[in-house]
C-alpha cells in the first residue's frame, strides 16, 4: 500500500494526471497510428481514440489510423479481465496481430 501511495503522489504521476494533451494533439501533422486494447482498464479505448482522432484532425491531418483490439489489455496481451494483477500471469508478451499491424502501417508510410 505504501508503494502505491508513493507512486500516486510522485511528481511524474501528479503531472500526468493533470496534463491535458489536447493542445499537443492539435499540433500533430505527421501520420498517426493510435491503438488500444478493448480490455485496457488504464486507458479507456473509446474515449482515448475518439479524442485523438478529433483533435488531430482539427488541424487538417487526415492521416490518422485508429484500431481497437478485442480481448487485449493495456500491454496488448490477450486477457480475460484486463486487470493489472493479470499482467504477470499471461504468457503472451504482445499479441502478434498488433506487431503485424504496426509493421504494415510503418511500411505504408515510406
Label every PLM stretch briefly.
Residues 1-23, 30:
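Alpha/beta-hydrolase
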Residues 19, 43-46, 92-97:
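Soluble non-cytosolic domains of exported or imported proteins
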Residues 28, 34-36, 40:
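Short beta-strand/loop motif that positions the catalytic acidic residue
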Residues 29-31, 61-64:
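Loop/turn elements at helix/coil->beta-strand transitions in domains of secreted/extracellular proteins
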Residues 41-51, 59:
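Conserved alpha/beta-hydrolase "acid-adjacent" motif
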Amino acid at each position: 500500500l505504501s508503494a502505491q501511495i508513493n507512486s500516486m503522489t510522485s511528481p511524474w504521476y501528479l503531472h500526468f494526471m493533470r496534463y491535458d494533451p489536447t493542445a499537443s494533439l492539435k499540433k500533430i501533422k505527421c501520420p498517426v497510428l493510435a491503438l488500444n486494447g478493448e480490455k485496457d482498464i488504464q486507458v479507456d479505448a473509446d474515449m482515448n481514440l475518439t479524442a485523438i482522432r478529433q483533435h488531430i484532425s482539427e488541424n487538417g491531418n487526415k492521416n490518422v489510423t485508429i484500431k481497437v483490439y478485442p480481448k487485449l489489455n493495456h500491454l496488448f496481451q490477450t486477457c480475460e479481465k484486463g486487470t493489472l494483477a493479470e499482467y504477470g500471469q499471461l504468457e503472451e508478451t504482445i499479441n502478434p496481430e498488433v506487431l503485424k499491424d504496426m509493421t504494415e502501417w510503418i511500411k505504408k508510410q515510406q
